[in-house]
Amino acid sequence: VNADSGRMNGEYKILKSDGTDFTGHSGGIVSFGRYVYLTDGYFLYYIPQIALSGGSKNIRIEGEIRLPVSASFITVFDGYLWAGNFYHKSYANNFDVSVKDGYGKQYRTLIAAYRLDAKKRGGIRTSDERGTREAVIYAALAAPDEVQGAAFLPNGDVHLSCSYGRGVMSSQFLYSYPLKEECDGVVSVGKRVVPLWFLNNDRIKRSLSAPPMSEGVVFKNGRSYVIFESAAQKYRDTAMDPTDCVWAVNW
């Protein structure tokens, strides 16, 4: 969709690199440099941005990179691609790392930082693990449950979009940029030990309630823009206050 006119530029069907249909979750999507990135579980897929020119068509994934932490949302900031998992208590084993902050609160959402590198294939620094290219994690943020989307403001503040359930109000949180401070500790992810910061009450700046089923978020031109899943065909008849609009948040 053209951001200025509001008109649709094209609709794209995504194919795997072998030409078969891509049927993954596509929990997160972001564009940076030469590529559009999307996630599905433990894999990050990349598509050349140039493939999206010329209107509606099929586009093919160029390659994939394995992730050490499952990813349901992604964003880009300060030279890193940040990807995190979705955790809710009803999914007992849906996490890779469990850590406690200084107050004893448990965190099972981990937002991992992977270094962007235009010189590398796929634009991400990787190592060769088990014959598969795996993204190298450099740092991590421990975040609250139910994160559906994340975005960084220009000053580094972190906006988290959190929701779960068709009849439960979603929450939007704004945290101060943690990496300008000394890390809160370290965390082991695979074979690496990386610095860890908590997005907890010590760093929260603002919070607000929003309609149910908030999903991805992006920051542009001074505002956060949040999309919702409630008006999707699958949910619109049963969700509370379904909305088919993109909502703007002026922090």
Where are these regions (language model features)?
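Blade-loop segments of beta-propeller domains
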Residues: N2-R34
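Surface loop/turn motifs at the tips and blade-to-blade linkers of beta-strand repeat domains
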Residues: Y12-D21, E62-L67, Y138-A143, L199, ...
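Repeated scaffold domains used in trafficking and secretory/extracellular systems
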Residues: T20-G28, E64-V76, P144-G149, S209-F219
